[in-house]
């Protein structure tokens, strides 16, 4: 028994440093992924814009994305709950707009490129203009949010937490304006020659003239047709239709 006890102590003495090194390695990797870091923000934005440039079929109205610290702060607050349940839309609202949301959870910190790649891989189940199957095992919402033409701001966060005693890492990105409109989710962008919708505001196949406002009514074109843009309803809920002329909206 004494020999077995001694062997156990030796094994434990060897194992503990290994576990400590593994925890330190995970912590170091996590610290390199936090979105307070400018290089991480740049990586996230650049990957999204690269993916948006290469959609098939090509997009005529795809906006260039930029980092939003306000959206990122909302994502940081929500990510700390370590909950994969979609957040309340009011918790991811910005002035003049609402934001969409993508989430992913891992057991070990992986690169943002890998996470965004997982979301984008849903494109294999999506065909522009066609409605995706209702099969519960198939989702394309993460992909369509990434390539939603009018989403021009992005802010993301990563949180370290534990579930049932095991480490977990929650990745959250907020996209503004929000995408995945149920009525048009099969067409996240307009097809055509890149920048066809913004010939005077084009940068490497992406439009740079977003409408900063958001229509909160789905039928604002009808509302404005009958009420005009000076009516209290359209002033509050149809700002994009009333205030943006040539901008992408």
Curated annotation (Swiss-Prot):
Keywords noted in UniProt: Disulfide bond, Glycoprotein, Signal
SMART domains: SCP (SM00198)
An example Gene Ontology molecular-function term: calcium channel regulator activity
Glycosylation sites: 230
Residue ranges of every copy of the SCP domain listed in the record: 45-175
SS bonds (residue pairs): 195-202, 198-207, 211-244, 220-238, 229-242
GO cellular component assignments: extracellular space; nucleus
Domain (ShKT) ranges: 211-244
Signal peptide: 1-21
One Pfam family named in its UniProt record: Crisp
Family of the protein in this entry: Belongs to the CRISP family.
Protein name per the record: Cysteine-rich secretory protein 1
